[in-house]
Amino acid sequence: MRRNNENRTKSRRQQEQSVDPAALLDFVTPTEFVELPSKGIGYPSGHPLHNQETIEIRFMTAKDEDILTSRSLLKKGLALDRLIDNLLVDKTLKAKDIIVGDRNAIIIAARSSAYGYVYETKVECPNCGNKQKHEFDLSKADIHEPLLGEDIKELDNGNYAVSTPYSKIEVEMRLLTGRDEAVIFKLMNKNKEGDAILSTQMKLYIVSVNGHKQDNVIEHFINNVPAAEARYVRNAYKDLAPTIEIKGDFECESCNHEQELEVPFNTDFFWPDR
C-alpha cells in the first residue's frame, strides 16, 4: 500500500514538473506601436517598413536585460542589435536593416516602457569637465522627419538624388541603417580621435555619382569635390535623414556654463549607473 502511495505521489510530481510555465502565468507580454520618424520613407519597395508609419515591439523582460550586460555583445557592438531583434514582433525584420532614426525611436520606447520616462545620468560639462547628475525627460522627444527640398528627387528604389550647385554632379544617396552604424562603430574603436568619420559616412550613404556605382569613383568624388559642394551633399543628407533626439537644458554646478545637451543612444542609455 505504501509503495502505491509513493508511485502516485511520484506521478503527480512528474505531472506538476511538466506543466508549461507560460500556462501557469496566464498573460502575454504586452506590446506597443512605436511611431517611426521616417514614416516609412526611405525604405525600398518590398521592405517590411516601406511606407509604414509605426512598428510593433514587445515590452522588455529580464531576459532582454541580460543582453545589455553581455560583455561579449557589448565589446562587439552587437548588444543593441540583439535587443532590438528580440523586441520586434515581426521577425522578418532585422535591426541592422532599420534606418538609424527609426532604431533610436525603438530604443527610446523600449527604455521608457521598462524604466519610465525620467532618465537620470551623469553628464560632463563641455566647458570645465565637471561631472554631475542630470535628468532628461524621454517623453519630450524632438522628431525630425525627412525634408524633401526642391533640389532633392525621391527615387523609386527608396533612395534620393541631389545635384551639386556648381559642378552639377548628380549624387544618389540612401539612408544609413544599423548595418552602417556597425561599420562606423568599428572605425571609431580603431581610431579614437574620430578622424575621417565624415568621409566614411559619405562613402556609406552615397550610392552613385553621375550613375557610376564603383567604389573608386565614389571615393574620388569625396576626396576631390570642392569643400562647398561636399558640404552641400552632407547638408542634403542631414535634411533627408529622419532623427529623434532627447535634449535638455544643462547648467554646470561648478562653472555655471549653460548649454543644451543631447542624450546619446548607446547601451549606457539603459544602464546609466553601470
Regions found by a protein language model. Name each.
Residues 1-274:
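Long C-terminal interaction/binding lobes of large macromolecular proteins
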